[in-house]
Amino acid sequence: MNLNSIPAFQDNYIWVLTNDEGRCVIVDPGEAAPVLKAIAEHKWMPEAIFLTHHHHDHVGGVKELLQHFPQMTVYGPAETQDKGATHLVGDGDTIRVLGEKFTLFATPGHTLGHVCYFSRPYLFCGDTLFSGGCGRLFEGTPSQMYQSLMKINSLPDDTLICCAHEYTLANIKFALSILPHDSFINEYYRKVKELRVKKQMTLPVILKNERKINLFLRTEDIDLINEINKETILQQPEARFAWLRSKKDTF
């Protein structure tokens, strides 16, 4: 299996997973034009689309792609049924695409019906987890998003986080505003800044490394707890997550 990315809009990535025969699955195609261009250039044969949630920048290209490739199966949660999904999927479902088994996780928070697709090592997590951050809570609660992130955090160390936006630099700047002396975050900031100066992507990221630099995965970390305690005493990791998310919303 080979992982490919197609830039879209201002900061989206449309992921394309291909096998040795050139058959492919397209993840969250927010627009069709760059996908069609890549398909023509690489002579890919689209077999399926994975949708993580219903937002337009993740589903906007589905109907046009289906006009070109009507044989494709479009998998998505119930909230994408009117966005082009042909096969509805949910928590605990397994599907076989490109000869590989993918497991579905419900990850509510960003939207109520958000799902992730996992076939080791690839995790297509849409707008749930970003490098250094997590999605805004447009529909779900902090508790829901926290539990969703803990599902992801329980995956194997070598999991490749294939999220949908290039938000890494801004997220790491936020992390440094909370833990300015953290050695892992500072090292990652230098690396990410260098990549972005060269207009190179920072994704995908390995979960093992993400646990070190993403504050939203470190709500039981003593350094973070001590920093939060300077402002407010929060006993539960879910409450610390909510505090962080609130801070990020206004950063």
Curated annotation (Swiss-Prot):
Name this polypeptide is given: Hydroxyacylglutathione hydrolase
SMART domains: Lactamase_B (SM00849)
Pfam family, one: Lactamase_B
Top-rank taxon, per record: Bacteria
Cofactor: binding comment: Binds 2 metal ions per subunit; upon overexpression in E.coli the enzyme purifies with various amounts of iron, zinc and manganese. The endogenous metal is unknown.
Cofactor: Fe(2+); Zn(2+); Mn(2+)
Family to which this protein belongs: Belongs to the metallo-beta-lactamase superfamily. Glyoxalase II family.
Function: Thiolesterase that catalyzes the hydrolysis of S-D-lactoyl-glutathione to form glutathione and D-lactic acid.
Subunit field text: Monomer.
InterPro entries from the UniProt entry: Clx_II_MBL, Glyoxalase_II_hydrolase, HAGH_C, Hydroxyacylglutathione_Hdrlase, Metallo-B-lactamas, RibonucZ/Hydroxyglut_hydro
Pathway(s): Secondary metabolite metabolism; methylglyoxal degradation; (R)-lactate from methylglyoxal: step 2/2
Positions that bind a divalent metal cation 2: D57, H58, D127, H165
Assigned keywords, A-Z: Hydrolase, Metal-binding, Zinc
SUPFAM superfamilies tied to this protein: Metallo-hydrolase/oxidoreductase
